[in-house]
Amino acid sequence: MSNEVTIYFDRPMSFEPNNIQPLNGITGLYFIFSQTIDIQYPFDKSKLLYIGMSERKTNSIGSRLLGHFDGKSKNLGLTNYRKVEPLLFTYINFEMLKNIWQFRIEDLESYFILDFVEQYGVYPICNNKSGFEIQNKTLTSSFKIDWKYFK
């Protein structure tokens, strides 16, 4: 592992269409989380509900988030948490990491999910997939992820 980069998240945004629309055409990772509900994971509490990604500009962060917002993604967990309280989101533009991450966005998502599992003991509560793909890669970068952001 040659270089460690600390990942800090941008300010939280309200999970609503007027904040989602400007993200059309942007690829990367996005994080949906609660404003006040602490999820008790095995190792610690977090407000993080979901880690997602967009790998193509035609299926951008904006369109993926809109799919979660209007229920088209069929993620019942996110839909039901949103019924209880307004949610927040933040994102990482993949363009910002291209110089230090040599693999696909899918692998970056797997890295983040597996790192969350290591810190909290299980996948984010609304994620339904695993992140095993990255385990077969030889990594030249590692990320120290600021999971405290979601506390």
Model-found features: residue ranges?
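Boundary/linker segments flanking structured domains
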Residues: 1-151
